[in-house]
Amino acid sequence: MLTFVGLGLYDERSITIEGRDALANADRVFAEFYTSKLAGATTSDLEAFHDVDIEVRDRVGIERDPEPLFGAARDGSVAVLVAGDPMIATTHVDLRLRATEREIDTRVVHGTTAQTAASSLTGLQNYRFGKATTLPFAYGSGGVPESVLTTVSENRERGLHTLCYLDIEAEREAYMGADDAARRLASAFGEDERFDAGEETLAVAIARAGSPAPTVRADRLSVLSTTDFGDPLHLLVVPGDLHHVEADALEALAGAPEDLISSYRVR
C-alpha cells in the first residue's frame, strides 16, 4: 500500500488526524520537499512529533528512480509525505499512476492547500478564482513569462482572481518573496497594454499561510514591491472584479486602501 499524506501548510501540527494515523501505521515513511515545504518545521521536527523515521527523497528519487519506494510499497505499508495536499502537484499524480500500473494499491490523505488558505485569509470567494499560475525565478533577467501574463489577463477579462504561486528552489533554499513577485509584475504590467493600471494594479500578498500569525496585505503592486513580508512561504493574488463582500473583506482583513478598492467593486 502506498499512501500519499498531505502535511498541510505550516508545521508538524498542520496534518490531519487521519494523516497521523497513516504515519503511525506505516512500515516506512518517505517525504519530498522540492515541490513545496513546511516553512515552520524541519524533517527532525516531523520525526520527533510523529515518532517516525523519515527518508527524504530528492527529485531524482521521486521522478526518475521511484523503484525503491515501489518495492517497499509492495512488501508493506508506505507513506509519502507532501506539504499541502498530495495531488496538487503533477509529480505526485504521475507517481500514483505508475504505482497503479504496477498493481500497487494507493490511497490519498488530503491536507490543507495554499489555494483554500488564500481564499480563507483574503475573503475572496473560492469560486471566483480562475486558472492559477506560477511565477518562476529563472526567466530572462528577472522578467515575467508570457504564459503568466496571459493567465492573469484572461482571468481579469472574465472578472476572476488569479492565484500566483511563487517559485521554490529547494536545492539552494531559495523562496521567492511576495515583494519580489510584486516588483516583477509591476514592471511587466507597466509595459503591457492589457494592464491599464500598470504598477498601480491591486494585488494581495499572503505570507506564512497556515501559521499562527499569517500576514495578508492588499495594496498597489508598487507598494507591495517595497514591503518586507518576512519569512516564507509567500503567495500573491491578483484580484479580478470584487463582489461587495470581497471588497469589504480586503479592506477589513488586508488593509486595502478604500480609494483603490472602489474601482474594482462590481456595480
Q: Residue locations for each model-derived region?
A:
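Class I S-adenosyl-L-methionine
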Residues: 1-105, 109
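Structural motif
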Residues: 1-3, 27-28, 53, 77-80, ...
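Residue-level signal for pocket-adjacent positions within structured domains
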Residues: 10, 127-130, 219
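Alpha-helical scaffold segments in soluble metabolic enzymes
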Residues: 45, 68, 72, 98, ...
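A short acidic, often aromatic-flanked loop/helix-cap motif at beta-alpha or helix-coil junctions
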Residues: 60-66, 114, 171-172, 210-213
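Short, surface-exposed amphipathic charged segments that create phosphate/polyanion-binding patches used
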Residues: 67-75, 120-125, 143-147, 216-223
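Class I SAM-dependent methyltransferase SAM-binding "motif I" and its flanking Rossmann-like core
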Residues: 84-161
